[in-house]
């Protein structure tokens, strides 16, 4: 039986859309890659809220660490 791929819908945000992200859990025991994602998003301290452009790259970074970061507002 041939394998078929799932069709995935990609959500495209309107131009200029912003995401508010909040760092909710410490990355002390997290793997190094997760720490690098937190740093790459621009977080410097716990419970910090930052605003980033809504892009596939930012959403991908948030998807890597959903247990550490939450989307406050879209």
From Swiss-Prot:
Subunit annotation: Part of the 50S ribosomal subunit.
Keyword terms: Ribonucleoprotein, Ribosomal protein
**Protein name according to UniProt:** Large ribosomal subunit protein uL30
Q: List the disulfide bonds.
A: none
Which Gene Ontology cellular-component terms appear in the entry?
large ribosomal subunit
Q: Which gene encodes it?
A: rpmD
| Keyword Manganese annotated | no
Gene Ontology molecular function: any one: structural constituent of ribosome
Top-level taxonomic group: Bacteria
Q: Which InterPro entries match?
A: Ribo_uL30_ferredoxin-like_sf, Ribosomal_uL30_bac-type, Ribosomal_uL30_ferredoxin-like
Q: Which Gene Ontology biological process is one annotated for this entry?
A: translation
Concerning NCBIfam families, the annotation shows: rpmD_bact
Q: Which family does it belong to?
A: Belongs to the universal ribosomal protein uL30 family.
> Which organism does this sequence originate in?
Koribacter versatilis (strain Ellin345)
Q: Where is the signal peptide?
A: none
């Amino acid at each position: 039986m041939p394998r078929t791929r799932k069709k995935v819908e990609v959500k495209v945000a309107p131009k200029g859309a912003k995401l508010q992200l909040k760092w909710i859990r410490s990355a002390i025991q997290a793997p190094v890659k997760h720490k690098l994602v937190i740093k790459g998003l621009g977080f410097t301290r716990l419970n910090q809220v930052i605003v980033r452009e809504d892009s596939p790259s930012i959403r991908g970074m948030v998807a890597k660490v959903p247990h550490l970061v939450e989307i406050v507002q879209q």
